[in-house]
């Protein structure tokens, strides 16, 4: 899917992150890490409130959707309300858990309880129920919280040609499993883009992905197995990749009823 709220795989996130632009974006810090910088929001301000909440006020830059319409704060309000709405059934809804009103939305289905607003066309305001150190770096840069237009064609998520996007690249062609995206003339940060055209190939066959890479028919792939890498160790250069693995133990299962066993597993 190319619906920001519904993405779950790395490949989906990569494509969505090139087609859409969030409030903030990540760039290289020149030392192997990343830093947060302005994206669709040209600036922001953070206020600590007396009740312990925090309010972020984002001022949007002048950006256009791929159909020429202006990107507004209302587009972010709609996208974030839609993400939190239990009716959307997004697997990424918990990204907004720190936003005030999130739990009320989840229990009632009333998206108006989410503390996000657009007091002006270019002003997006978010109130957090408490401080969140990763709000800017992980929530405001995430694929799932990208802006979404409320008026879209039916089944737009499954039809790349119907997508209305605001990012650095816009879809120019969708043919035979290949999605071609080019940089629009109106994009504000063209000078930093190293490629004017990207071609995404959707290939579910792992062996075919490896073959395409070996033949230099693609520049980048996801999902190579350890077995494939071990076959030609001199071909690949390993690099670190940040990842968190979680093991959830069903304590109600008879086979895991022993506390000593669970402690041994940890």
Question: Across the structure, where does each feature detected by a protein language model lie?
Answer:
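Aromatic- and charge-enriched surface segment that lines or borders ligand/interaction sites
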Residues: 42-95, 125, 255-257
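Sec-exported extracytoplasmic/periplasmic mature domains
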Residues: 24-28, 81-89, 131-133, 140, ...
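N-terminal lobe/hinge region of extracytoplasmic solute-binding protein
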Residues: 1-51, 164
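Solvent-exposed, polar/charged alpha-helical surfaces in well-ordered, non-transmembrane soluble domains
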Residues: 17, 21, 42, 74-82, ...
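Gly/Pro-rich hinge or "lid" segments in bacterial periplasmic/extracellular proteins
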Residues: 122, 128-197, 207
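Surface-exposed binding/hinge segments that line
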Residues: 70, 75-77, 88-149
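Short, solvent-exposed loop/turn elements at domain surfaces
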Residues: 1-6, 26, 31-36, 67, ...
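Extracellular/periplasmic solute-recognition and catalytic clefts
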Residues: 172-180, 199-255, 264
């Amino acid at each position: 899917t190319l619906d920001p709220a519904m993405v779950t795989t790395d490949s989906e996130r990569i494509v969505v992150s090139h087609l859409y632009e969030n409030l903030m974006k990540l760039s290289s810090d020149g030392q192997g890490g990343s830093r947060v910088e302005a994206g669709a929001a040209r600036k922001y301000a953070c206020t600590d409130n007396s009740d312990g909440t925090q309010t972020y006020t984002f001022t949007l830059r002048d950006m256009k959707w791929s159909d020429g319409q202006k990107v507004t704060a209302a587009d972010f309000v709609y996208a974030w309300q839609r993400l939190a709405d239990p009716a959307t059934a997004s697997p990424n809804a918990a990204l907004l858990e720190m936003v005030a009103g999130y739990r009320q939305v989840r229990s009632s289905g009333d998206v108006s309880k989410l503390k996000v607003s657009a007091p002006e066309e270019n002003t997006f305001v978010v109130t957090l129920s408490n401080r969140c150190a990763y709000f800017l770096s992980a929530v405001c840069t995430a694929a799932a919280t990208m802006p979404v237009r409320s008026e879209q064609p039916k089944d737009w998520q499954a039809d790349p040609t119907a997508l209305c996007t605001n990012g650095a690249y816009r879809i120019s062609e969708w043919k035979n499993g290949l999605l071609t995206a080019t940089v629009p003339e109106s994009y504000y940060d063209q000078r930093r883009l190293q490629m004017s055209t990207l071609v995404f190939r959707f290939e579910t066959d792992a062996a075919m992905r490896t073959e395409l890479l070996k033949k230099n028919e693609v520049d980048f792939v996801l999902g190579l197995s350890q077995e494939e890498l071990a076959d030609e160790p001199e071909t690949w250069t390993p690099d670190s990749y940040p990842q968190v693995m979680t093991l959830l133990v069903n304590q109600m299962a008879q086979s895991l009823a022993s506390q000593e066993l669970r402690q041994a597993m940890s």
